């Protein structure tokens, strides 16, 4: 038997009536204390620049996906202006890798986070024509050694634009909560049968 680490995937389903235009998304893993481990997916348009043309408006990405951007600053030491943030502390020992957490038999666990934000979706509370309602954070605790292969990501908070602070008064958000139909984390057994062992 050829032992391989477990593999992580994230099936997602959107509510079709509420996904035009397509929202911006970031997916990352973090420790149970809130330190980012690794960015697993980031909307390509937001990957390399701080100011982006977000469906016709020039917007800072820390206003689009503020929670992800704040977590990234904390481990990279680079703030949203591109400058080194001396208050974030040293990051030289950060591995930026999820692999060490995907080890069976060691009671490993981590949190998968998905931040999603749709442009131009203002409501009575959030009236900015550019930003509209804030980004929403969905999370799931993943325990590597559990027999449960799927975890549902639950709506947890929304992001404070520019600051990345978590806000929990989700009753102030309206249609943005209907963007996502289902988000799952799937942890697959990475072990594969060694064909030579059956000969």
Predicted regions and their residues:
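Short amphipathic, basic-aromatic surface patches that mediate peripheral association
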Residues: 5-22, 45-47, 122
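Intrinsic-disorder/low-complexity, polar/charged segments enriched in Ser/Thr/Lys/Arg/Asp/Glu/Gln
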Residues: 5-9, 93, 111, 137-139
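Short, solvent-exposed aromatic-acidic interface loops
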Residues: 15-16, 39-49, 155-166
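Short beta-strand/loop motifs in extracellular/secreted proteins, especially
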Residues: 23-25, 110
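Beta-strand signatures of extracellular beta-sandwich domains
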Residues: 26-30
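Structured domain cores in non-transmembrane regions
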Residues: 32-122
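Glycine-rich, aromatic-bearing surface loops/beta-hairpins
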Residues: 100-199
């Amino acid at each position: 038997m050829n032992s391989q680490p477990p593999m992580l995937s994230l099936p997602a389903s959107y509510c079709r009536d509420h996904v035009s235009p397509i929202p911006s998304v970031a997916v990352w893993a973090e420790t149970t204390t809130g330190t980012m481990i690794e960015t697993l997916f980031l909307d390509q348009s937001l990957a390399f620049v701080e100011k982006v043309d977000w469906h016709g408006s020039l917007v800072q990405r820390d206003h689009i996906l503020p929670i992800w951007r704040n977590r990234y600053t904390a481990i990279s030491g680079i703030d949203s202006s591109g400058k080194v943030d001396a208050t974030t502390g040293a990051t030289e020992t950060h591995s930026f890798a999820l692999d060490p957490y995907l080890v069976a038999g060691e009671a490993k666990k981590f949190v998968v986070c998905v931040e999603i934000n749709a442009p131009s979706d203002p409501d009575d509370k959030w009236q900015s024509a550019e930003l509209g309602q804030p980004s929403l954070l969905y999370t799931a605790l993943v325990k590597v050694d559990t027999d449960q292969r799927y975890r549902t990501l639950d709506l947890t908070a929304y992001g404070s634009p520019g600051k990345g602070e978590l806000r929990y008064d989700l009753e102030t958000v309206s249609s943005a909560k209907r963007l996502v139909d289902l988000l799952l984390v799937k942890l697959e057994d990475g072990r594969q049968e060694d064909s030579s062992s059956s000969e």
